[in-house]
């Protein structure tokens, strides 16, 4: 069930059970008759891994930046709202294992649960593959979010940035298509497919068409920027 997620983060787990644990909330574990490990310990580990990876990357990217500037940039990148947004871009809500009560109270959309799951996932990557693999995953999933300057400024308009990049690389624009919608009227989810000029396809599901398009554009940006890094 985690094939797409592993593809999105560019990492295939040797022990898929670690990823399953990373997506397991304590509410789900508490409902099981047998002992099941939840993601809080992995979250603790992933928080430290993320902070180190981001610190190392910022240190390398901005050799002239002062300590205060680096601290502010790191704080923006690893803040709970930023991590929740990143988790939504990866559609982690689709993989969470939640207890019935948490599910009924909208836990799948709760930012705190999503940011915790993202940190737990990074902790799982670290345990499964070591620091270098965890660092590669962090660099990949944050590819569209690294600051452009020491003030930490970076546009969040992924569609505009993607269009500029594809025009430069392919002299063509990406194509967006609405594939459908689901859910009740007050909680509709929209699926968008984005096709790059080279035929690479990305899909995203969001609470609005515009949001889904931005999410798909963010995934495409990460892909193109990781190609240039490689």
From Swiss-Prot:
Q: Does the keyword Cytoplasm apply?
A: yes
Location of the DRBM domain: 157-226
Subunit and interaction comment: Homodimer.
Family according to the record = Belongs to the ribonuclease III family.
| Documented EC number(s) | 3.1.26.3
Q: Where is the RNase III domain?
A: 2-130
User: Coiled coil located at which positions?
Assistant: none
Q: Which UniProt keywords apply?
A: Cytoplasm, Endonuclease, Hydrolase, Magnesium, Metal-binding, mRNA processing, Nuclease, RNA-binding, rRNA processing, rRNA-binding, tRNA processing
Q: What is this protein called?
A: Ribonuclease 3
- Has keyword Cytoplasm? yes
């Amino acid at each position: 069930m985690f094939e797409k997620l592993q593809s999105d983060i560019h990492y295939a787990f040797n022990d898929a059970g670690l990823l399953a644990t990373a997506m397991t909330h304590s509410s789900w574990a508490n409902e099981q008759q047998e002992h099941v490990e939840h993601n809080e310990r992995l979250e603790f580990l992933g928080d430290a891994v993320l902070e180190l990876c981001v610190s190392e990357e910022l240190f390398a990217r901005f050799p002239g930046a002062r300590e205060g500037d680096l601290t502010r940039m790191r704080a923006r990148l690893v803040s709970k709202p930023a991590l929740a947004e990143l988790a939504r871009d990866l559609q982690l809500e689709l993989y969470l294992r939640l207890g019935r009560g948490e599910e009924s109270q909208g836990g799948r959309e709760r930012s705190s649960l999503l940011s915790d799951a993202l940190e737990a996932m990074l902790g799982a990557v670290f345990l499964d593959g070591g620091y270098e693999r965890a660092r590669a995953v962090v660099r990949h999933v944050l590819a569209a979010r690294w600051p452009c300057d020491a003030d930490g400024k970076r546009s969040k308009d992924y569609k505009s940035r993607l269009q500029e990049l594809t025009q430069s690389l392919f002299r063509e624009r990406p194509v967006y298509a609405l594939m459908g919608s689901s859910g009740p009227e007050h909680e509709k989810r929209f699926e968008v497919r984005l096709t790059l000029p080279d035929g690479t396809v990305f899909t995203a599901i969001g609470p609005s068409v515009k949001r889904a398009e931005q999410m798909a554009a963010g995934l495409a940006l990460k892909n193109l920027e990781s190609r240039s890094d490689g």
